[in-house]
Amino acid sequence: MPEKDDVSKIHDKYTLSLINPSSHYISLAASIAIAGLIGAFTASTYLGSTELIFPTLAVIAALVGTQFLDILFAKHREYSKSLHVSLFGNSLFFVSTLIGFGAMGLFEKDGLDLFYVTMGMVVFASFRIGIFTTILGASLKKAWAVAFIQPMAMYLVLIPSDMWISSLTNPWIILFGGAFLGLATAWSYLTDKAGRPGLRSTHELIQAYVTSMSRKDPVPLEEIIEKSSTESTVSTSQLKFQSSDKDNDFRIVLPDIHPGPFHPIGGSNITGLIYKEMDSTAMVMHSISNHDLNLPTQKEVQNYLQSLQESKSKQNGAVCTEPVSVTMNKARASGLLFDRTALLFLSLSPHGMEDLPPNVRSEIEQFAENRNFEQVLIVDTHNAMGKEISKEDSEDLLLAAKSTLDTLKTKESHSFKFGFANSEKMNLNQNDIAEGRIATLCLEINNKKYFLGWADANN
C-alpha cells in the first residue's frame, strides 16, 4: 500500500478527533449499562456472589451520583463532554475485568485475581487525568482531585470493605498503578508544552478546537490563531459582465484569500460570504493561493468584505475570443481572452491535486506581461483532497498555460452574449454544496454557446 500524503494523514487525524457518540444521552445510557455489567460481572466472577442486583445497582448509583461532580472541574461546565469521558473510562474499566477473566483461563489459574478489577479502576482514573487536562481544561492539580472520584466510588461500593486495604495495597497495584498514573501525569505535562515557544499551551489549542466543533463557537480558537497571524496585502480580481441596459450583471471573482482554515473558523466560508456580498450573482473561483492566506477571525472577514466596495475598474471591453484548451500529459489549461484580459483555468482533472504553488502564478503572470496582456486571471480548479503537485505536473501546467496564452493572442475576438443561472432558489441542501451554491455561465460567442459550470464545493 502506498504511503499516504500529508493532507490525507491530517484528514485521518481530523476524522479520528470526531469519534464520539451522537448524543450525550447515548453516552449516559451506555455508561449506565457498562457500569451495570461491571457490577454484575465482578460480583458473579471475582467475588463469587449470587446476589447480583445490589452490586449492580450500587455501581450504577455511584456512577450517576458522581457524574455531576465532573462538570464542576470542567472549564466550560460542559456536561456532554463529561458523559463522553465516563463512557470511554468505564469501557476501559470493564475491559480490564474481562482481561483478568481471560487470563485465568489462559494461564490455568485456580481463581480470579482482584488485581485486574483494581487495575481497571486505576486505568480509569489515569484516563481521566489525561482527558481532564487536555479536553476539559482542568489543571493537573484539579485533574488529580477529580480523577479518582468516580472510579473509586464505583470500586468501593462494589468491593467488600474487608477487601479494600488488601486490594489497594497490593505491591503490583502500587507498581503498575503508579506507572499508569505517572505516565498520564507526564503525558499531560509534556503535551501541554509541546507547542512552545510558538504556542503557550497546546491544551488550550485543543480545547479551543473542540469548542469550535462541538459548540460552533469560533472565538477561543480565533483568538489563538490571531496571535500568530501577520498582516498582508491581497488583491481580489473581478470580471464583471453587464447587460447593455445595465439591469443585469454577473461577476467572476478571484480572491487571493484562501478558504479556511476550517468551519467555523475565520474565512472558512469566505466563498459563500463573497457570493452573498455580490447579491448572489457571482462565481467565486479559487485563485492560486494557499492556507497561508486564511483570514484568522470573523472580524478580519468583515474587514475584507467591506474592502470589496472599494473595487476599481482597470479595463472595459465588449469582445472576447472563443475558448482555447491545451493538454500536456495530465495537465490541462483552458482560457478565453476578454479584450486584453485573459481568463485561465488550470487542472489535472480527473486526477486530484493540492493547491497550486505560488511560483506557477508568478511565472504565468510574468509570461503574460511579456506578451503584452493587460492582466491574466488564473483559476486553480484542483480537487481538494489530491496530492501535492509534482514538479513534472507543475511544469506541464506551465507549458499548457503558456501555450494557451500564445494561442489566444492569435484568436479573433467577437462580441458576445451572456446568461447566468444558479441554484439560489432551488433549495439544494446537500453536505457537499456550500453557501456559494451551484452556478452556470453561458457565453454565446460567434454564434456558438459555451458553458462554464461552478460549484462552491472545494473546501
Can you say where each PLM-predicted feature lies in the sequence?
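Terminal domain-initiation and capping elements
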Residues: 2-459
